[in-house]
């Protein structure tokens, strides 16, 4: 069972600094990923952002810390904390790197992402938990999979142990008392509640 201390009022209102929920949307809601290669390239860029190195292969301080991500077909969710640069500069860095790859591969020049950056400041633990849960539940809500663990292109697989090498996310969350197992329980509990609600609705409809 998820620790009650995580959901207490005091914990939910704990202030966080420099954390943002970023959504990178495709221009005119068009797709930004066409196949597995595109998605793997984007994840490679995220690794370079969170684990940068100089020309000699010496590790550098991260541009940002990523706590969650989800690669949908026409948009991307990222939950991040600012590192050596501001959030907008980091997102621009990610965007430019992926656009260069995408344009070269498909020989195109049209806009790929919307010019306006969609982001919300995550200023307390309560909203952090909501964002963490929402991002990992995105493929389930979209009807792509029945469980977050079945979606290949989100950070949930890092938290549940399906991926244990070349991880992008920091699993040390910006507050105490919550580990990877707690994150999985928090996210999956929503799926269970949704399934229960659907079963209840179907039962009621049969009775009417």
Model regions and ranges:
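Short Pro-Cys-Gly-centered "Cys-loop" motif that presents a nucleophilic cysteine in a tight turn
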Residues: 1-68, 72-73, 81-208
């Amino acid at each position: 069972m998820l620790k009650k201390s995580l959901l207490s009022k005091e914990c939910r209102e704990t202030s966080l600094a420099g954390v943002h929920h970023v959504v990178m949307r495709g221009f005119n809601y068009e797709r930004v990923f066409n196949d597995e290669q595109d998605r793997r390239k984007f994840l490679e860029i995220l690794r370079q952002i969170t684990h940068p190195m100089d020309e000699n292969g010496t590790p550098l301080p991260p541009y940002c810390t990523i706590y969650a991500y989800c690669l949908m077909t026409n948009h991307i969710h990222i939950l991040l904390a600012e590192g050596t640069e501001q959030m907008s500069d980091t997102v621009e860095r990610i965007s430019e790197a992926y656009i260069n790859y995408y344009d070269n591969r498909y020989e195109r020049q049209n806009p790929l992402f919307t010019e306006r950056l969609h982001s919300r400041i995550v200023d307390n633990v309560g909203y952090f938990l909501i964002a963490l849960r929402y991002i990992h539940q995105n493929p389930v809500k979209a009807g792509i999979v029945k469980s977050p663990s079945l979606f290949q292109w989100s950070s949930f697989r890092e938290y549940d142990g399906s991926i244990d090498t070349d991880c992008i996310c920091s699993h040390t969350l910006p507050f105490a008392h919550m580990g990877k197992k707690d994150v999985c329980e928090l996210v999956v509990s929503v799926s269970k509640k949704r399934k229960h609600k659907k079963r209840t609705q179907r039962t009621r409809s049969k009775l009417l």
